[in-house]
Amino acid sequence: MTSQPFDLITVGGGLGASALAIAMARQGARVLIIEKEEKFRDRVRGEYLSTWGVAEARALGIADLLLQDCAKECPWIEMGFGPRNVPETTAQGMSPITYSHPEMQEVLLAEAEKSGVQVRRGSIVQGIEPNASRPVVTTRNGKDERIGARLVIGCDGRGSAARKWAQFESHKNAQPFQFAGVLLTGVSGREDLTTFLFNPELGLVIATVPQTKRRWRAYLGYPVNGGLALQGTEKLKVFLAESAKVAPGVGESYADVECVGPLASFEAGENWVNHPYHDGVALIGDAAGTNDPTFGQGMPMTLRDARVLFDALRAHSDWDRAGHEYARQHDQYFQDMRKVCGWLRTLFQDPGPEAQAIRQRAMPKIAEDQTRVPDHLFGGPELPCDETVRARLLGEL
């Protein structure tokens, strides 16, 4: 069966898909979201949207909706240098926001439907046929269906099938770390402050992210060579014990917690596509590129992808040209953020002897001048990331 074509089809219905679909539908585009999940469930995902990501959400017209229905502002952060007021110390002047990831997804998908987007849940995409003039998506939901569009967007995450179907070449950079997370109640701490702390001598990093309904998402990054297997709620005591090693006071903050969601871990490696557009198919978010999750840049990057593609589609009547323009910009900001996160990983997380030598040189200088640490995690990829920035961070200047 062949259906009438849409302007835009998204494979996946998460953050990037819904944000882009809402923006396009408000401009009069005919948009279809195909989401295999009939209901989003709690998994270990990002739930802290840093300042530059909030700016992208505002540009796409969804920030106020999130704050109204599922999110809260979390303006303070502690990274070992004392509490920092993020909106007062970033160019955007906006507070980071936090939320439950599945609740955010449901809110945005409902808004997409209100905006005129056709949403199909429980449908399984079976393939994509790239074509610069009319790509086709094949789905199954009781029957096979071929659906054409001007543009197909793969928004189906780090294990993207769309990436494979459209024959994009993936590039991988494995990292010797795992990243685990769990949803907790009973954390002792300020509900307007996120904690993000490293212990590089042990290769450990923790984050505690307060969200709505007095819940906290707790994260732990740890070396793969330590023999830990943090999978399943029966491993909660191990998760908490390892987290307590990062810094004084962490164990006390977890003394009375209860687990209210799954405990899971995954690899902290990088995976990306160069130039994530060809022949009528674009990739955004984790489908286009997965950065090291330790640094929490996945959601801001997803919203940047959605906004840049949205702007390109509005600017060019030739959507093939628009797709290439999006992909060109994506490569630049994705690789800039990847580069900076690599520097931060070396200095703050790598327990190896070379990194230890760098810390001995760099940390005394940083203690005297914290502007040596580049602020891309909050300010975004427009900040400088040249050789001078690297050398100042690593104490070479």
PLM-predicted stretches and their roles:
Residues T2-P5, A55, A59, A63-W165, ...:
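Conserved N-terminal helical subregion
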Residues E38-R58:
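Conserved N-terminal glycine-rich FAD pyrophosphate-binding loop of Rossmann-like flavoproteins
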Residues R134-E145, L151-L263:
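Conserved FAD-binding catalytic core of PHBH/FMO-like flavoproteins
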Residues L230-D320:
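FAD/FMN-dependent oxidoreductases across multiple families
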